[in-house]
A protein has these predicted regions:
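ABC ATPase NBD coupling module
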Residues: 12-28, 52, 169-173
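Conserved ABC ATPase signature
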Residues: 78-82, 86
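Conserved ABC ATPase "signature" region
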Residues: 57-74, 125-126
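Conserved ABC ATPase "signature" C-loop
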Residues: 157-158
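ABC ATPase "signature
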Residues: 163-164, 172
Length: 183
């Protein structure tokens, strides 16, 4: 089945023939491939998204986001010099530079070692708190879903099975599939 619509801030943003994010005002995404400008430094990759603003604002906002995403030590490196975890943090910084109300993350923890994962989760929590934005992330890792989410949507074969808090879903899984998925 491929039916239904998605609304964001009371406007329809998705149907079968449309894409959810590109061009949808107020929604930003961190892709798995990061989409960084190869010859740009970390600083320029982030600042590039503020080109329409005055230079003083570009600089102050870029500095704020660099600090928020813990990128100070690599600010002058180009994207080709960065590790995967560093690239992911730069992609995150690019996505939040205009403070979207909603941030989508595609498997944000899947390619990170435990130390990098813990740091990235801390950064995300700080972003949510400081910028008051919402996160929606896709994961196949039940531990990440259960330990990092306020609410979980369990989807099977493209259909929503259940929405609930991690503790509610663990205590009363809606199906055998959900119980297996959540461990």
């Amino acid at each position: 089945r491929d039916t239904g619509e998605i609304f964001f801030q009371n406007e329809r943003v998705f149907n079968k023939s449309e894409k959810l994010v590109p061009g949808t005002k107020g929604i930003a995404i961190v892709h798995q491939d990061f989409q960084l400008e190869p010859g740009y430094t970390v600083y320029d990759n982030i600042r590039h998204h503020l080109i329409q603003f005055q230079k003083s604002y570009q600089e102050s906002k870029t500095e704020e986001i660099i600090t928020l995403c813990h990128l100070e030590s690599i600010r002058n490196q180009t994207s080709k010099e960065l590790s995967g975890g560093q690239k992911q943090k730069v992609a995150l910084a690019k996505a939040i530079i205009e403070e979207p109300p909603l941030l989508l993350l595609d498997e944000p923890f899947s390619n990170l070692d435990n130390i990098s994962k813990a740091e990235f989760k801390t950064i995300l929590k700080n972003i949510v708190k400081k910028l008051t934005i919402s996160l929606l992330f896709v994961t196949h890792d039940s531990i990440d879903a259960l330990t990092f989410s306020d609410e979980i949507l369990i989807i099977q074969n493209g259909e929503l099975l259940k929405k609930g808090t991690p503790s509610d879903l663990i205590q009363k899984p809606p199906s055998k599939y959900a119980a297996q998925l959540l461990g």
